[in-house]
């Protein structure tokens, strides 16, 4: 696997990513998420396209997933052309026992959420390090640059401590694929993710936040190559 896909090979991520790719069949329109675990899914789908004649269309969530899909030989479409997806597969920064999920470490959570809610089935792939009884990691919040300070003030009133995400290899803040800023907001333990999600969505200037409440299934890869599957209780 190339360095653009993952920085280091991970048996757990590989197992989860490849297992989720097995859910895809010819004729499907597939949402392709962003991150190191779903990179294995994209690569496996590409292998099946080339070796098995798998006929699918992919909808990407970021520049990274677009480049991976092109490298893999997956034909791409857009939500404008195909607004209803059969399945979306994505990674997670953290996921709790009720399948509430925090995403956005790659600053792609706005597009990831749009793609996930456009799919009939949303599957998250992860390793054990991403699972937790309750969510407690910072929540990424994409904001309009124009609205940054008012949004910060309102988020503080919700009990959060926002921090503007800085770029690593350039001066200044991270800029999303949509041209916006990202705030990483520390809330401590999040006891009611659904309520917090609604409160963040109501803040003027917030484009989207990284709390996802629509995960249908979680595929957890293990070091021995096995995969544990957890489904949302209906």
UniProtKB/Swiss-Prot annotation:
Pathway entry: Carbohydrate degradation; pentose phosphate pathway; D-ribose 5-phosphate from D-ribulose 5-phosphate (non-oxidative stage): step 1/1
The reaction(s) this protein catalyses: aldehydo-D-ribose 5-phosphate = D-ribulose 5-phosphate
UniProt superkingdom: Archaea
Keyword list, A-Z: Isomerase
GO annotation (BP), single: D-ribose metabolic process
GO cellular component: a single term: cytosol
GO molecular function per UniProt: ribose-5-phosphate isomerase activity
EC numbers: 5.3.1.6
UniProt: substrate binding residues: 34-37, 90-93, 103-106, 130
Location of the active site: 112
SUPFAM superfamilies in the record: D-ribose-5-phosphate isomerase (RpiA), lid domain (SSF75445), NagB/RpiA/CoA transferase-like (SSF100950)
Quaternary state and interactors: Homodimer.
Sequence similarity: Belongs to the ribose 5-phosphate isomerase family.
Record's function text: Catalyzes the reversible conversion of ribose-5-phosphate to ribulose 5-phosphate.
Record protein name field: Ribose-5-phosphate isomerase A
Organism phylogeny: Archaea, Methanobacteriati, Methanobacteriota, Stenosarchaea group, Methanomicrobia
